[in-house]
Structure formats: structure tokens, C-alpha cells
Design a protein with these regions (language model features):
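Active-site cores that bind ATP or allylic diphosphates and position pyrophosphate for catalysis
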Residues: 79-185
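N-terminal Rossmann-like or analogous alpha/beta NTP/dinucleotide-binding catalytic cores
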Residues: 1-90, 179-180, 184
């Protein structure tokens, strides 16, 4: 509702995007129900983007660009290993990735027996932006969350890679999210 009000009051274009990357949790009937509910509430949209589950080629191309620029690397850590390595956790319960696989050599990577997830190398500097509701938000990603996964070990692309790829392709300039997602914006 807030996204719709924000867009309509500014004369913008409302985009509906179905974020259905996770094949285990997302189903076509959920997306259909979501649309039906929005219509029932009187919330319309101007553009319906292709569902993320059908945009794998776009995410693969974005990932390949990051790989070409050496901005991603394979990570072989299990969740259990990460829980143990990052204790104590951040105050919000988020795991802070300690960089375990960031500097592995080619020989060390070749010796691994697990399929890797892929992490984005975050900059070692502070970033800031002005959120329309929360004001100026500043974070140091390397300290506050560490390098984050952009492709899971099963090959599914992460939300963070998908949404920026989709926003760029769709010319999206304003994003309305819950404050719980502010740190991943």
C-alpha cells in the first residue's frame, strides 16, 4: 500500500515484480493470489516485469560480468561452519561472514569437495545513501555483514543480484521496502 501511494502521489510508474527465485518456496498459485489480492484492494500497476524465475539468463550475464572483474569468488563453507566461525553474531542475529574463502588459492579451491556458493567481494569502505523515510543510512559492509552470497551452491541466484539486475533493466529509480531490508539495500 505504501509503495503504491508513494508512486501514485509522485506521478510515477508502478512496477509489479514477482520475486520467485526460490523454487522450493515459490509457486505460480501464490503469484496469482498476490495479483488477485492487489486487484481486490484497488492497487493497480503499470508494468508487470517478467517473473524472476524466467530471467536466469539475465542474472547469469550479470554474474559473468562480476566474475570477469574478479568481484566474486567461490565459498565452500557450510552454514554450520559459518555459525561457529562468526560467533558472537551481530546484534540483529545476522551472521557476519569472516572471509574464510576469500583468499583461497586455485589449488585450495581444487581440493574442495563441496559445490561452492559464490560471494560478492564487498568494498572495505563506508557507503551511505539517503533513504526517503529513514534518512541517511551508513554502513561498512566488510565489517557489518561481510562478503555476501549472490549465487547459492545449487545455482540459484540470490535476491540481491536479481533485484539490482531487474531494477537496472527496468529503469527503476525508487524502491519501497520494509526497514528490515535497509541493510541489504
Amino acid at each position: 500500500l505504501l509503495a503504491w501511494l508513494s508512486v501514485r502521489s509522485a506521478g510515477g510508474e508502478m512496477v509489479l515484480r514477482i520475486e520467485d527465485l526460490d523454487p522450493d518456496r515459490c509457486r505460480a498459485e501464490y503469484a496469482a493470489q498476490l495479483k488477485e489480492d492487489l486487484i481486490w484492494l484497488g492497487l493497480d500497476w503499470d508494468v508487470e516485469q517478467t517473473p524472476q524465475s524466467l530471467r536466469t539468463a539475465a542474472y547469469h550475464a550479470a554474474f559473468a560480468q562480476l566474475e570477469e572483474r574478479e568481484m566474486v569468488y567461490p565459498c565452500y563453507c557450510s552454514r554450520g561452519e559459518l555459525h561457529a566461525a562468526s560467533a558472537p553474531h551481530a546484534s540483529d542475529g545476522q551472521l557476519i561472514y569472516p572471509g574464510t574463502c576469500r583468499g583461497l588459492t586455485a589449488a585450495q579451491r581444487a581440493a574442495q569437495t563441496r559445490r561452492p556458493a559464490w560471494r560478492l567481494r564487498v568494498p572495505e569502505e563506508e557507503i551511505s545513501f539517503c533513504d526517503g523515510l529513514q534518512g541517511v543510512y551508513t554502513e561498512r559492509l566488510d565489517r557489518d555483514c561481510g562478503d555476501f552470497i549472490i549465487r547459492r551452491s545449487d545455482g540459484v541466484y540470490a535476491y540481491q543480484l536479481a533485484v539490482v539486475t531487474d531494477d537496472g533493466a527496468g529503469g527503476v529509480t525508487q524502491i519501497v521496502r520494509g526497514c528490515d531490508l535497509l541493510s541489504s539495500t
